[in-house]
UniProtKB/Swiss-Prot annotation:
Subunit structure: F-type ATPases have 2 components, CF(1) - the catalytic core - and CF(0) - the membrane proton channel. CF(1) has five subunits: alpha(3), beta(3), gamma(1), delta(1), epsilon(1). CF(0) has three main subunits: a, b and c.
Membrane topology qualifier: Multi-pass membrane protein
Compartment(s): Mitochondrion inner membrane
Matching InterPro entries: ATP_synth_F0_asu, ATP_synth_F0_asu_AS, ATP_synth_F0_asu_bact/mt, F0_ATP_A_sf
Species the sequence originates in: Penicillium chrysogenum (Penicillium notatum)
Identification of the protein by name: ATP synthase subunit a
GO terms for MF: proton-transporting ATP synthase activity, rotational mechanism
Amino acid sequence: MRHLDFVLSPLDQFEVRDLFSLNANLLGNLHLSLTNIGLYLTISIFLILTYSLLATNNNKIIPNNWSISQESIYATVHGIVVNQINPNKGQMFFPLMYVLFIFILVNNLIGLVPYSFASTSHFILTFSISFTVVLGATILGFQRHGLKFFSLFVPSGCPLALLPLLVLIEFISYLSRNVSLGLRLAANILSGHMLLSILSGFTYNIMTSGIIFFILGLIPLAFIIAFSGLELAIAFIQAQVFVVLACSYIKDGLDLH
């Protein structure tokens, strides 16, 4: 009797699957479904709301650990907004930046839980967020400056002969913000999880091959543990980088530089 061995791809963990689906005859052929990415996004929102309620600490004067952690996040995001935009105009964008930071951070952390789903590894999610941010910054620029907003694509002090080429380069660079902002987040999360999956499978195969290989497998196992700590740091760093770049794009819309 032959045994078939199936080799699972490291990309299988990122596959979007239907968990529940319903076909209804309302409004034509209506298909309703709950996917794993939808489920984990719902879980992340629930965790954020729970965290916010715990951090209020029933409005007590003495803060608890949840309150201290939330105040640290507040201070971090507020410092980014003030430094990247400015102390006055930046205040109105602080709630948006805080929501972006905590949403990306929580979804990054959920993805680190074994057998969970990394929502921020999907480009459809990160591109949707980045496109919304860049589009909002562009609308803000036109609202404040009108057609003068196009001066953002004209480098100061450039020769007249090179002006058409430089304007084209600046315009393409501006459009690429939609892609680069979302691509940076998804690519970092995707590559980290793929590497952990490959190393985990490699270590498992070594450690189940005998006592000697089990001892040798402790070396890559230690590396996996260390790399998991690095992934935890990357979860925070990528949320911070996303907010920093979002603030810089908003600043361009406000100040045209």
